[in-house]
Amino acid sequence: METTTPSSALETHRDRPESSPQDLEDFVVEFWGVRGSIPTPGQETIRYGGNTSCLEMRVAGKRLIFDGGTGLRALGDSLAEQMPLEAYIFFTHYHWDHIQGFPLFTPAFTPGNCFHIYGAIPPDGESMKKHFIERVLHPNSPIPLKGLQADLRFYELKAGDSLQLDDGIEIETGQLNHPNTAMGYRVTWKGRSVVYCSDTEHLPDGLDDNVLELSRGADLLIYDAMYTDDEYHNPKSPKVGWGHSTWQEAVKMAEAAGVKQVAIFHHDPTHGDDFLDDIERQVQAVFPKAIMARERAVVPVGG
């Protein structure tokens, strides 16, 4: 393991075969975990899913994984027949719901696999690798560091950094408004782009310029819309300052940034399928190309 610094039409997938080489030649997003805070299995979350944050971008023959919530376990299991493999993992931040799937990510235990792991320098100034490992391995899980047999390479990022992968894949970063900080990502390839902004809270006096600039003209904006406006401002239990936003603010940002499609993401654990269906109707009434993030849903990007 090493730490380095880098240079500056929704389709359900539950009954679909595992991704083919042709899939990897294009640009698609697949959702593996769409919840916030805590996994929520049960009868009320069957249609949207109960795993915490994890999504995969397959672009130009490469796998880019964003966040490692409990959805990462299922993603890892789906890759079991494709080893050895190389992939890139990007973390927005290190709260539990974005890292708790890593100790159950089977490919990390397999010799011959290689993972390039990117994340922000922690607020306390310690190395990203140390900060990450201490949270996902012993004593917080029974897994010792030596159990991870894959080649893990760590790269530290600062908000505003950008990097180039092979085949013309560009990745840009931006600061998000979240306790202990978080980082948003924009992935661009052949003029098509996806922006991933989770977790982030809108500002009280206008749009967040960091998110706005990162999102301008994107084909798809995946946005933290954990609450409704009514929940966010509820005088009995306000959510102001908790680091999350609303679907109404997602629409405002999408319209201001001129994005083509917005995905409502990071669903509250109390929001069951019927509640999310109702949000979908409301958001599509004002932004027809909006979608609700669902586990195992695949979204083609541009094209």
What are these regions (language model features)?
Residues 2-195, 206, 211, 277-303:
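Binuclear metal-dependent hydrolase catalytic cores
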Residues 197-199:
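DG-centered beta-turn motif at the end of beta-strands
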